[in-house]
């Protein structure tokens, strides 16, 4: 599925295995396991849900439209675009930008679509407004032959679904939105999109076994969490995902929410950023190499690219070179890794055997566990987001003026 290499995080000389062992990670481990065992947080329980038959009525539609914000949609996008980067029957409406939303609705035949309305609270402003845009268009049809599915626990959207007898799936109350990709939030639309959701859960379960290991060097979620925690304490509080697989771009968006919203509490927090190699070597690498030394880089690489071929070309000295196309980006990644390490920039590497359902299930679950461990290290609640509530109240007030 995947492997984790932390050698360069130590090689730059700012932290050592001794420093890692000085961190009270055993307490962080036991505290998180207690919360998972007692159901205080439920993101582990949901990966063992065997009842996937409930999604069987959700396929057979030409288009899949998903409406949601943040944790209600980013995990689905991360997995779908990683696994199916060249398919175009998915439409994700994840903003209140009129140009984006209305351009999608202009080209989608709703009669040939299954439409997901996803909001745990049922009151998310953007999701509510975008649902009403859909509703207006459906009401103008002579008959609606598509399907509306609501994934919500309450609020205005649940009342709408019940009033109109639409299908409703719920989300476990102990699973925050940004941890909900392995619930109906992610599994239902992914099933409609033809993704093998059983393999996603299988990958998450395999990673869960690994994350049960109390030996930190054999537990990538715990080890990566401790390494980032230590570097944060040393002033490196910007965590950059640098993916050399472009289809993982949306994983980076999911990662930004997971890290930012979970750990940005009580004056703590790591700032998550996303770079795509090799193209960002021509924009951001100068900053990473020669700018402020306040970053730790996580390289994302694949052992195998799904599309590849033999190529021949001439270099700048007219010398012929023969190689696989993928050898180019592999060499660029390795060169960047070596150069950053030589310049004292700590980095780790996650290698996915192949970009498939199992690997993505494992990857997302590893990061959920990592954030759970880091919440314990910082002694914060990684599962709420109290600071954003103020903006929501102000926004509703402005809209009603």
UniProtKB/Swiss-Prot annotation:
Listed GO biological process terms: gluconeogenesis; glucose 6-phosphate metabolic process; glycolytic process
Gene Ontology MF: a single term: glucose-6-phosphate isomerase activity
Assigned keywords, A-Z: Cytoplasm, Gluconeogenesis, Glycolysis, Isomerase
Keyword presence, Isomerase: yes
pH dependence as annotated: Optimum pH is 6.3. 50% remaining activity is observed at pH 5.3 and pH 7.
Cellular component terms (Gene Ontology): cytosol
Active-site feature positions: 261 (proton donor), 282, 392
SUPFAM superfamilies recorded: SIS domain
Enzyme class, spelled out: isomerase
Annotated S-S bridges: none
Summary of the function given for this chain in its UniProt record: Catalyzes the isomerization of glucose-6-P to fructose-6-P.
Family according to the record: Belongs to the GPI family.
Name used for this protein in its record: Glucose-6-phosphate isomerase
Provenance organism: Methanocaldococcus jannaschii (strain ATCC 43067 / DSM 2661 / JAL-1 / JCM 10045 / NBRC 100440) (Methanococcus jannaschii)
Name of the encoding gene: pgi
């Amino acid at each position: 599925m995947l492997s984790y290499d932390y050698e360069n995080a130590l090689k730059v000389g700012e932290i050592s295995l001794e420093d890692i062992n000085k961190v009270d990670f055993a307490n962080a481990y036991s505290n998180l396991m207690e919360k998972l065992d007692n159901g205080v947080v439920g993101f582990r329980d949901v990966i063992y849900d065997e009842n996937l038959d409930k999604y069987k009525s959700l396929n057979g539609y030409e288009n899949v439209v998903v409406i949601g914000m943040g944790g209600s949609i980013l995990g689905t996008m991360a997995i779908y675009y990683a696994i199916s980067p060249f398919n175009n029957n998915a439409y994700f409406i994840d903003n209140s930008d009129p140009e984006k939303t209305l351009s999608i609705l202009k080209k989608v035949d709703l009669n040939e679509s299954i439409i997901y309305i996803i909001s745990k609270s049922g009151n998310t402003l953007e999701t509510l407004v975008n649902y009403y845009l859909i509703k207006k268009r459906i009401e103008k049809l002579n008959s609606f032959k598509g399907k509306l599915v609501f994934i919500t626990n309450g609020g205005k959207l649940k009342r709408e679904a019940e009033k109109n007898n639409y299908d409703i799936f719920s989300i476990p109350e102990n699973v925050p939105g940004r941890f909900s990709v392995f619930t109906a939030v992610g599994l239902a639309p992914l099933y409609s999109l033809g993704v093998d959701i059983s393999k996603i859960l299988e990958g998450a379960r395999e990673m869960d076994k690994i994350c049960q290991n109390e030996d930190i060097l054999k537990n990538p979620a715990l080890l990566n969490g401790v390494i980032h925690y230590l570097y944060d304490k040393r002033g490196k509080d910007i965590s950059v995902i640098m993916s050399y697989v472009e289809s993982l771009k949306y994983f980076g968006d999911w990662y930004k929410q997971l890290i930012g919203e979970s750990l940005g509490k009580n004056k703590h927090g790591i700032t998550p950023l996303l770079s795509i190699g090799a193209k960002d070597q021509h924009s951001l690498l100068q900053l990473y190499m020669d700018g402020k030394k306040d970053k730790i880089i996580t390289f994302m690489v694949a052992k195998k690219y799904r599309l590849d071929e033999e190529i021949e070309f001439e270099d700048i000295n007219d010398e012929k070179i023969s190689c696989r196309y993928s050898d180019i980006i592999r060499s660029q990644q390795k060169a960047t890794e070596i150069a950053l390490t030589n310049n004292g920039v700590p980095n780790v590497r996650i290698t996915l055997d192949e970009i498939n359902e199992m690997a993505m299930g494992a990857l997302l679950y590893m990061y959920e566990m990592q954030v759970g461990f880091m919440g314990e290290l910082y002694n914060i609640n990684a599962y709420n987001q109290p600071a954003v509530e103020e903006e929501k109240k102000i926004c509703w007030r402005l809209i009603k003026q």
